[in-house]
Amino acid sequence: AMPKVDAYTKAADRKKTKYKGDVLFVDHHMAHASSFLISPYKKAAILTVDGVGEWTTTAYGVWENRSIKLLKEIHFPHSLGLLYSTITAYLGFSVNNSEYKVMGLSAYGNMDRKTNQYYNRLKEIIDIKEDGSFRFNMDYFVYHYLDKMPSKKLCDLLEGKIRKPDEELTQRHKDIAAAVQLITEEAVTKILNHLHKSTKCDNLVISGGVGLNSVYNGKILRNTHFKGVWLQPD
């Protein structure tokens, strides 16, 4: 993508604006990580989670001494944000716009990991390690090579067709929303506990699309060892 960006800024933008100065490329997740600049912390652990930026879907590290040190990145196609968007599309909502509806809908579903069958089915195709790193069985996803979200194989796993926007929302749909919320919370909690252990920071700044999941954000202080959390305003 970088050569295309460079070509665009040199050709189109410069002709329109007559700008002759330098054009700097800022990494997507490093831009998200800039949330520390408006936080009250001098040192903090940093987590950015979203769909994808360049090739990174999740990145974490530490802000200290006026610099960022990234500790780990997870790359496309393995993405919690794209998983959430896939289920958003499956439930009949618009992608990149209505994920918040799925988050809200999850509260009406079965949030018990032991008894939510759709959580257990999604767990079969998503491997979450103890440090929070994750890998998807891409046989169940098509977003990495097609301009669509739910695959037929995923529909079969969830035992139903993609919901039409005007179709009634059933308890099954609510339980599926709860399942993807549970998966997301589980992965992010493991990442944060590993991040706290690695950085020894008591404060956390979190950003990115998944970082706007307010249902989970309210649980961070309860479920992790962090004592302070700063959320990047949208």
What are these regions (language model features)?
Residues A1-D234:
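Short acidic/glycine-rich loops and adjacent helix/strand connectors
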